[in-house]
Amino acid sequence: MQIKNADVYVGGNKILKSLNWSMSEEENWAVIGNNGTGKTTFMKLIFGELIPVYGGKVRWFGNKGRIPLSEVREKIGYVSAEYQSNYDRPALGWEVVASGHFSSIGLHGDVTQKQKGVAFDSMSYLGIEYLSYTPYRQMSYGEARRILLARAMVHRASLMILDEPCTGLDIPTRETFLETMEKMSRKGTRMIYVTHRIEEIMPCFTHVLYLKNGKVFKQGRKEAMMNTKTLSRALDCSITVEKNFNRYYAAIGYKK
């Protein structure tokens, strides 16, 4: 994955500015920044929902030429709190998951037995097959989020985009979700994870990208990026970064 000199406009406003970034097939990235720094726009650029202007380029999966967006999206799963709030169609759990085959909100065609089987396999992998026949609207917030993760998996995505996926989850549900991500990473799924909570950066993540005012503030290996000075400057706040049990935690204010 490679982005070169990307300027991205949304509604006439320049959100991303001269952005350069690349990701190899063995890396998982966490993307950190305050609200309004362009994190979600960055994810939509990677997913192909937005395109750069003025000669900016996006290359997916090593392809140097043009590649149909339909092929790109078959290889990318996308989960976000925003998408969850937009999925308002009446549907059972398995139907929501199966809609991932069509990249649609709701089912707009017949589902083959093979497609249905893949949907059930995805739910089983995440341990949520018990939600197969539960109406989506009756699920808890955390259950619905995990259903959408299963939906993103039906294409056997090689890259998973997770845009603040733990927003609104309580601590036990969040930890279950994060443990699922670790499991997926061990199975070979690569991830880009947007957050402003560093405790969500699991051991599987290898690199960190900081966005600030629509630009790359700093990027590199996680061990070099996760420190008090860098995080404080990136978020314009005095923050102490600590590490415990291979996870990072933030506290407001510097240690004296």
Regions found by a protein language model. Give the residues of each.
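Helix-to-loop junction immediately C-terminal to a conserved catalytic motif
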Residues: F47
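Conserved ABC ATPase signature
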Residues: P135-M139
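Catalytic Walker B motif of ABC-type/P-loop ATPase nucleotide-binding domains
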Residues: M160-D163
